[in-house]
């Protein structure tokens, strides 16, 4: 899979997972409607389905996806929660994305 398509798929997967977890959080922590559990379940089902679209071995996909998840979660922190990440947050994301790139795009023998 091309690097751009892989990254786009990772981004969609991360957003689906975060939305699927954020909606129950709104229900449990902020007293929002229990009806939020319906789109949350759909979002988590989408998340699981998106994971099946990655062509690499599942362990490698989960490891590489974790790096993208960290980056998307930090952007979520900023845009949805209104908390601006600091320099150490961004450094952590950079290190994580370097690891993700190595795992996802390193040449493989065989």
From Swiss-Prot:
Keywords, alphabetical: Cell inner membrane, Cell membrane, Membrane, Transmembrane, Transmembrane helix
**Residue intervals passing through the bilayer:** 7-27, 33-53, 63-83, 86-106
The record's subcellular locations are: Cell inner membrane
What is one term from the GO cellular component aspect held by the record?
Answer: plasma membrane
Coiled-coil segments on the chain, per record: none
Q: What is its main location?
A: membrane
Membrane protein topology class: Multi-pass membrane protein
Q: Which Pfam families match?
A: UPF0060
Identify the domain of life. Answer: Bacteria
The family classification in the record reads: Belongs to the UPF0060 family.
NCBIfam families reported for this sequence: PRK02237.1 (NF002586)
Full protein name = UPF0060 membrane protein Ajs_2087
Question: Which organism is this protein's natural source?
Answer: Acidovorax sp. (strain JS42)
